[in-house]
Amino acid sequence: MAERVLEISSIHKAFGDHEVLKGVDLNLDKGDVVSIIGSSGSGKTTLLRCVNLLEEYQQGEIKIDGRVIGYSNKKNKRTRVNNKQITQDRALTGMVFQSFNLFPHLSAAENIMLALRKVQKKSKKESAEIAQHWLEQVGLPDRGTSYPGQLSGGQQQRVAIARAVAMNPKLMLFDEVTSALDPELINEVLDVIKSLAIDGMTMLIVTHEMRFAYEVSKKVIFMNDGVIGEQGTPDEIFKNPSSERLSAFLKNTKF
């Protein structure tokens, strides 16, 4: 039986009077790679931010590795857990954003080592070994001493990916990680994510790169106006869409 890593049940999220997520259900098993596509404003990024607990949500439940995260139900009252528990829950996921968010005063290796030492309390020696391992995995074996300002955008994003996976999360979240890159740098980042997929990393990916989503995903989710409009295998979504809305969306993409 497959090991369930992520279980999203009827998530509702509103900003004021504007409901962004209108009851989303989604499951990922260990090793699954699921891509989320859809127009801007459809709720893709908000869903990822709810999973990572960067956003609070008003209804529903998210479980990672069988444990409810972010909220507790005591005496039938739903309450947000304390900040210490939020930090522990968030550590179950690794998230890579559009912007690289590297510390400019730290080298590539030091950026990766920081959370290993501060959060996981690993020794400097072990943290350095882990950092070097992941720099090699993302194709930057000789750039550990380089600072972010000395790296290209693609290289910085690869360091950001290495920093996230070095923490050994149960689930990786990618939020349009190539959208801030020059076109010629996109493939080097996508190739790193593909290699993680081959290695069995469980991943939920928001992307505008349709060909990449087709090639890397076990399942593709099309979000439309805060709900899952359609989901299926890459062939079902990209070659045989069943809704007019998805067909119209795909006509405006580069797939």
Regions found by a protein language model. Name each.
Residues Y147-L151, Q155:
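Conserved ABC ATPase signature
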Residues A166-K170:
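A short, proline-enriched helix->beta-strand linker immediately N-terminal to the Walker B motif
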Residues L106-L114:
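Short coil-to-helix segment of the ABC ATPase nucleotide-binding domain corresponding to the Q-loop/switch region
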Residues G60-K74:
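Conserved ABC transporter NBD signature motif
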Residues Q231-G232:
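ABC ATPase "signature
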